[in-house]
Amino acid sequence: MLTLTRLDSAQPDFQARLARLLQFDDATDASIEEAVATILHAVKTRGDAAVLEYTERFDRLPAPSAASLELGAAELAAALAGLPEDTRAALEAAADRVRRYHEKQLQGSWTYTEDDGTVLGQKVTPLDRVGLYVPGGKAAYPSSVLMNAIPAKVAGVAELVMVVPTPGGERNALVLAAAAIAGVDRVFTIGGAQAVAALAYGTETVPQVDKIVGPGNAYVAAAKRRVFGTVGIDMIAGPSEILVIADGSTPAEWVAMDLFSQAEHDELAQSILLSPDPDYLDAVAAAIDQLIVEMPRAEVIRTSLTNRGALIRTHDLHDAAAIANAIAPEHLELAVSDPEALLPKLRHAGAIFMGKNTCEALGDYCAGPNHVLPTSRTARFSSPLGVYDFQKRTSLIHVSEAGAQTLGRIAATLAYGEGLQAHARSAEYRLTHK
């Protein structure tokens, strides 16, 4: 029998116990930081030569030149053509849904004109070039390609450069096919911190990008953190999370499997169930014990649920919503009979899955919204990856002669108050009646 943490929001020490449950040490190992710093410096100063050395060392992939590590469009097309018909259809259907959803996020430029003829506005511009990191080797994450690449393309990014490690030369056809479907422009078979460095600084062969997105291991995360400022990054993601609020109307087996869906990612993933019904919590616990023996990743799930999972009894659904807001989970499932009634109470979550038919796994692959979501309580101030992450906004100011008279006097007064005489004089030069 799996031992799960059981909490009750009525307990005097509930908040302290919940805080301990949510604690996660995201400090990067000093040896990783040191190794990443060395790799970044080498690639920054030595370019292609360093990339080739690290690719041979870490991926066991010797290459005569950095150019030979680039895959041509024909290879991506061949990977797509070689897929089983049902797999290709599923990828294309998912891509279409992701594309249609993200097209709703497009923002355009705008202006307005004041009474004196002054025009103010905002110019929205896509980024020029974006780098996409995709885990490679035996791990197949075609969904990650779609979720990162499609919003960039919808935003109008001119060039999307994907890096994907191929340990021992092992290429993943699903990943390459997804790149073809998503419209990735260039693909390099490099990975790790050296790939992040190549994208951030540019080499003789790999072009420098403006922003790097996509998941990776601890070395990739450390590298992204270090190059931020030279380039933009999407986020530094923590372990996967799911929080389920249930009223007992959803079969216990369904909710148990939903908890598994995040727990199977890794031992640090967090799966929590909130319910005011203690009998239902018992039923889910029993379902967990019954179903876990069927799972290929049972040991990972068991470790995750034992160390970081919890079944929490709440006073009512409103109490559950308040706890959910404090946790600010990556994925929030509302396994309740009336999710619309509960929705106004919820403020902080990466994505909200409403109703018993809406399992989190659908959002991971094909519902349409992005599966790149804030973790580790950052949903309190962060949003899912979207088209807006690949656009930037520039303020527009076109002051008329009449406007310069009013604004010039205001600006000069404030500038003199701050002791910035050149600012003040610059505004005063535009005054026709001084």
UniProtKB/Swiss-Prot annotation:
The active site is at residues 330-331. CDD domains: Histidinol_dh (cd06572). Keywords: Amino-acid biosynthesis, Histidine biosynthesis, Metal-binding, NAD, Oxidoreductase, Zinc. Substrate binds at residues 240, 262, 265, 331, 364, 418, 423. One of its GO terms (cellular component) is cytosol. One of its GO terms (biological process) is L-histidine biosynthetic process. Zn(2+) binds at residues 262, 265, 364, 423. Pathway: Amino-acid biosynthesis; L-histidine biosynthesis; L-histidine from 5-phospho-alpha-D-ribose 1-diphosphate: step 9/9. GO terms for molecular function: histidinol dehydrogenase activity; NAD binding; zinc ion binding. Binds 1 zinc ion per subunit. Its EC number is 1.1.1.23. InterPro entries: Ald_DH/histidinol_DH, Histidinol_DH_CS, Histidinol_DH_monofunct, Hstdl_DH. It comes from the Bacteria. Belongs to the histidinol dehydrogenase family. PANTHER family: HISTIDINE BIOSYNTHESIS TRIFUNCTIONAL PROTEIN, HISTIDINOL DEHYDROGENASE HDH. This is Histidinol dehydrogenase.
